[in-house]
Amino acid sequence: MRLQYRVLDTRLGDSIPLPHYATDGSAGLDLRAMVKEPLTLQPGDTELLPTGMSIFIDDPGYAGMILPRSGLGHKHGIVLGNLVGLIDSDYQGELMVSCWNRGQQPFTLEPGERVAQLVIVPVMQVELKQVESFSASKRGEGGFGHSGRQ
């Protein structure tokens, strides 16, 4: 699959690397904080960060997901403000990353720092069918915590 992209910040692909897969087994392309200067997030702060690029998936069978980088969350409490960003196949605007400092210490993001990852996933649009009832299943209406702790 080829993913169309546009560079919106001239530093991207010049002094700051374009997104790429770190290894042959990597699922996500690293997205970078294309801020103009270091940005300090105080505990509890959220900030919408530009990535300097836009994409066009151009296939309704796929979508993009912006996911956090595990090290930033575990070591520093830096996570996505919206937990997961969903990029529809027909979206063509700049990719933005909602960054939230849920940690106890201020954290400074440097220009070009990797802040999230983009994963392309298959999706299916469904046709809704209204029914009066469902055929019985083993789980039924059991919800949160229904299967217990094992």
UniProtKB/Swiss-Prot annotation:
Q: Name one GO molecular function term.
A: magnesium ion binding
* Pathway membership: Pyrimidine metabolism; dUMP biosynthesis; dUMP from dCTP (dUTP route): step 2/2
Q: What is its EC number?
A: 3.6.1.23
* Biological process according to GO: dUMP biosynthetic process; dUTP catabolic process
Which cofactor is essential here? Mg(2+)
Function in brief = This enzyme is involved in nucleotide metabolism: it produces dUMP, the immediate precursor of thymidine nucleotides and it decreases the intracellular concentration of dUTP so that uracil cannot be incorporated into DNA.
For this entry, the protein name equals Deoxyuridine 5'-triphosphate nucleotidohydrolase
- The encoding gene is dut
